[in-house]
Protein backbone atom coordinates (compact mmCIF):
# COMPACT_ATOMS: atom_id res chain seq x y z
CA UNK A 1 0.00 0.00 0.00
CA UNK A 2 1.03 3.62 -0.50
CA UNK A 3 1.70 4.50 3.14
CA UNK A 4 3.93 1.47 3.67
CA UNK A 5 5.86 2.32 0.49
CA UNK A 6 6.46 5.86 1.78
CA UNK A 7 7.58 4.55 5.19
CA UNK A 8 10.00 2.14 3.53
CA UNK A 9 11.48 4.91 1.39
CA UNK A 10 12.21 6.98 4.52
CA UNK A 11 13.76 4.00 6.31
CA UNK A 12 15.87 3.13 3.26
CA UNK A 13 17.27 6.63 2.88
CA UNK A 14 18.00 6.97 6.59
CA UNK A 15 19.74 3.60 6.61
CA UNK A 16 21.88 4.49 3.59
CA UNK A 17 22.84 7.85 5.11
CA UNK A 18 23.89 6.26 8.41
CA UNK A 19 25.88 3.47 6.75
CA UNK A 20 27.75 5.87 4.47
CA UNK A 21 28.37 8.36 7.27
CA UNK A 22 30.18 5.65 9.21
CA UNK A 23 32.36 5.07 6.13
CA UNK A 24 33.13 8.78 5.76
CA UNK A 25 30.70 9.58 2.96
CA UNK A 26 27.60 11.76 2.64
CA UNK A 27 24.50 10.42 0.88
CA UNK A 28 22.59 13.36 -0.59
CA UNK A 29 20.23 11.57 -3.02
CA UNK A 30 20.64 14.61 -5.26
CA UNK A 31 19.23 14.05 -8.74
CA UNK A 32 22.19 15.36 -10.76
CA UNK A 33 25.47 15.21 -8.79
CA UNK A 34 28.05 17.78 -9.99
CA UNK A 35 30.66 15.23 -11.01
CA UNK A 36 32.14 14.69 -14.44
CA UNK A 37 30.48 11.77 -16.17
CA UNK A 38 27.67 11.52 -13.62
CA UNK A 39 24.18 10.81 -14.93
CA UNK A 40 20.87 11.95 -13.48
CA UNK A 41 18.76 9.60 -11.38
CA UNK A 42 15.01 9.64 -10.93
CA UNK A 43 12.47 8.04 -8.63
CA UNK A 44 9.97 6.08 -10.72
CA UNK A 45 6.71 5.25 -8.97
CA UNK A 46 4.56 2.37 -10.23
CA UNK A 47 0.78 2.72 -9.81
CA UNK A 48 -1.46 -0.32 -9.43
CA UNK A 49 -5.22 -0.26 -8.88
CA UNK A 50 -6.99 -3.35 -7.56
CA UNK A 51 -10.54 -4.26 -6.63
CA UNK A 52 -10.93 -4.10 -2.84
CA UNK A 53 -13.09 -7.23 -2.66
CA UNK A 54 -10.87 -9.76 -4.43
CA UNK A 55 -7.61 -8.02 -5.38
CA UNK A 56 -8.20 -8.21 -9.14
CA UNK A 57 -6.30 -5.68 -11.25
CA UNK A 58 -8.61 -2.72 -11.93
CA UNK A 59 -6.40 -0.99 -14.51
CA UNK A 60 -7.34 -3.04 -17.56
CA UNK A 61 -10.60 -3.44 -19.48
CA UNK A 62 -13.31 -5.29 -17.59
CA UNK A 63 -13.41 -9.01 -18.27
CA UNK A 64 -15.80 -10.34 -20.89
CA UNK A 65 -16.01 -10.96 -24.62
CA UNK A 66 -17.38 -7.48 -25.32
CA UNK A 67 -14.51 -5.79 -23.53
CA UNK A 68 -11.95 -7.99 -25.28
CA UNK A 69 -13.45 -7.23 -28.70
CA UNK A 70 -13.47 -3.49 -27.98
CA UNK A 71 -9.83 -3.54 -26.88
CA UNK A 72 -8.78 -5.45 -30.00
CA UNK A 73 -10.52 -2.88 -32.19
CA UNK A 74 -8.67 0.05 -30.65
CA UNK A 75 -5.62 1.62 -32.23
CA UNK A 76 -2.44 0.60 -30.39
CA UNK A 77 -1.81 4.28 -29.58
CA UNK A 78 -5.12 4.58 -27.75
CA UNK A 79 -5.07 4.20 -23.99
CA UNK A 80 -8.24 2.13 -24.33
CA UNK A 81 -6.26 -0.52 -26.18
CA UNK A 82 -4.61 -1.33 -22.85
CA UNK A 83 -6.69 0.27 -20.10
CA UNK A 84 -10.27 0.23 -18.89
CA UNK A 85 -12.20 3.16 -17.42
CA UNK A 86 -10.30 3.33 -14.12
CA UNK A 87 -6.87 3.00 -15.70
CA UNK A 88 -7.52 5.48 -18.52
CA UNK A 89 -8.99 8.12 -16.21
CA UNK A 90 -6.14 7.63 -13.71
CA UNK A 91 -3.57 8.03 -16.50
CA UNK A 92 -5.26 11.20 -17.74
CA UNK A 93 -5.32 12.72 -14.25
CA UNK A 94 -1.58 12.15 -13.86
CA UNK A 95 -0.95 13.87 -17.20
CA UNK A 96 -3.20 16.86 -16.50
CA UNK A 97 -1.58 17.55 -13.12
CA UNK A 98 2.02 16.65 -14.05
CA UNK A 99 3.29 20.23 -14.07
CA UNK A 100 1.92 21.05 -10.63
CA UNK A 101 2.96 17.69 -9.19
CA UNK A 102 6.55 18.39 -10.21
CA UNK A 103 6.91 20.79 -7.27
CA UNK A 104 6.17 17.94 -4.85
CA UNK A 105 7.79 15.08 -6.75
CA UNK A 106 10.94 17.03 -7.73
CA UNK A 107 11.33 19.64 -4.96
CA UNK A 108 14.99 20.58 -5.52
CA UNK A 109 16.43 23.16 -7.91
CA UNK A 110 18.85 20.50 -9.12
CA UNK A 111 16.12 18.16 -10.38
CA UNK A 112 14.99 20.24 -13.33
CA UNK A 113 18.11 19.66 -15.38
CA UNK A 114 16.96 16.05 -15.68
CA UNK A 115 13.97 17.05 -17.82
CA UNK A 116 16.15 18.33 -20.66
CA UNK A 117 17.99 16.67 -23.51
CA UNK A 118 17.95 13.04 -22.40
CA UNK A 119 16.10 10.20 -24.09
CA UNK A 120 16.11 8.33 -20.78
CA UNK A 121 14.22 11.05 -18.88
CA UNK A 122 10.87 12.73 -19.58
CA UNK A 123 10.69 16.18 -21.12
CA UNK A 124 6.95 16.66 -21.56
CA UNK A 125 3.66 15.36 -20.17
CA UNK A 126 3.02 12.43 -22.50
CA UNK A 127 2.57 8.71 -22.10
CA UNK A 128 3.72 5.68 -24.03
CA UNK A 129 3.89 1.93 -23.91
CA UNK A 130 7.51 1.01 -24.68
CA UNK A 131 8.96 4.53 -24.58
CA UNK A 132 11.58 5.37 -21.97
CA UNK A 133 11.40 9.03 -22.90
CA UNK A 134 7.74 9.35 -21.89
CA UNK A 135 6.66 10.75 -18.52
CA UNK A 136 4.18 7.91 -17.98
CA UNK A 137 4.48 4.35 -19.25
CA UNK A 138 1.77 1.70 -19.32
CA UNK A 139 3.71 -1.46 -18.52
CA UNK A 140 2.94 -5.10 -17.92
CA UNK A 141 -0.23 -6.98 -18.75
CA UNK A 142 -2.94 -8.94 -17.03
CA UNK A 143 -2.60 -8.87 -13.25
CA UNK A 144 0.74 -7.00 -13.60
CA UNK A 145 -0.67 -4.12 -15.68
CA UNK A 146 0.33 -0.80 -14.12
CA UNK A 147 1.35 2.81 -14.81
CA UNK A 148 4.94 3.94 -14.26
CA UNK A 149 5.35 7.62 -13.35
CA UNK A 150 8.89 8.88 -14.04
CA UNK A 151 8.42 12.43 -12.71
CA UNK A 152 10.06 12.19 -9.29
CA UNK A 153 13.57 12.56 -7.91
CA UNK A 154 15.10 10.43 -5.12
CA UNK A 155 15.16 13.10 -2.39
CA UNK A 156 11.45 14.00 -2.66
CA UNK A 157 9.28 13.72 0.45
CA UNK A 158 7.63 10.35 -0.29
CA UNK A 159 4.42 11.20 1.55
CA UNK A 160 3.85 14.37 -0.47
CA UNK A 161 5.02 12.82 -3.74
CA UNK A 162 2.76 9.78 -3.42
CA UNK A 163 -0.21 11.76 -2.07
CA UNK A 164 -0.04 14.23 -4.95
CA UNK A 165 -0.07 11.41 -7.49
CA UNK A 166 -2.99 9.66 -5.81
CA UNK A 167 -4.91 12.95 -5.76
CA UNK A 168 -4.20 13.51 -9.47
CA UNK A 169 -5.34 10.01 -10.39
CA UNK A 170 -8.51 10.31 -8.32
CA UNK A 171 -9.27 13.68 -9.92
CA UNK A 172 -8.95 12.06 -13.33
CA UNK A 173 -11.43 9.39 -12.26
CA UNK A 174 -13.84 11.90 -10.71
CA UNK A 175 -13.88 14.02 -13.87
CA UNK A 176 -13.68 11.01 -16.20
CA UNK A 177 -10.73 12.52 -18.05
CA UNK A 178 -9.46 10.81 -21.20
CA UNK A 179 -5.74 10.67 -22.08
CA UNK A 180 -4.39 11.69 -25.49
CA UNK A 181 -2.88 9.09 -27.84
CA UNK A 182 0.42 7.50 -26.84
CA UNK A 183 3.71 8.83 -28.16
CA UNK A 184 6.65 6.91 -29.57
CA UNK A 185 8.88 10.00 -29.76
CA UNK A 186 11.67 9.82 -27.15
CA UNK A 187 11.96 13.61 -26.96
CA UNK A 188 8.28 14.13 -26.22
CA UNK A 189 7.72 16.49 -29.16
CA UNK A 190 4.25 17.98 -29.51
CA UNK A 191 3.21 18.35 -25.86
CA UNK A 192 3.76 20.99 -23.21
CA UNK A 193 7.26 20.70 -21.78
CA UNK A 194 7.67 19.92 -18.09
CA UNK A 195 8.73 22.84 -15.87
CA UNK A 196 12.26 24.02 -16.57
CA UNK A 197 12.76 25.33 -13.02
CA UNK A 198 11.40 24.79 -9.53
CA UNK A 199 9.84 28.27 -9.72
CA UNK A 200 7.83 27.22 -12.78
CA UNK A 201 6.70 24.07 -10.99
CA UNK A 202 5.58 26.07 -7.94
CA UNK A 203 3.57 28.40 -10.20
CA UNK A 204 1.92 25.38 -11.80
CA UNK A 205 1.14 23.91 -8.37
CA UNK A 206 -0.43 27.18 -7.22
CA UNK A 207 -2.64 27.20 -10.32
CA UNK A 208 -3.58 23.52 -10.04
Q: Which functions belong to the PLM regions below?
A:
Residues 30-55:
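Histidine-centered divalent-metal-coordination microenvironment in nucleic-acid enzymes
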Residues 1-11:
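Active-site acidic/histidine clusters and adjacent loop/turn architecture
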Amino acid sequence: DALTAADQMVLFRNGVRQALRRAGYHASFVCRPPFEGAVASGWHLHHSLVHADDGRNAMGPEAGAGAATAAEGMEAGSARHWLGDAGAHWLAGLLVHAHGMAALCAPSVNAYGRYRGSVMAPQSAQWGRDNRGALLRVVGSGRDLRIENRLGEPLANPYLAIASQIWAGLDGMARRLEPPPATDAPDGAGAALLPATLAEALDALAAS
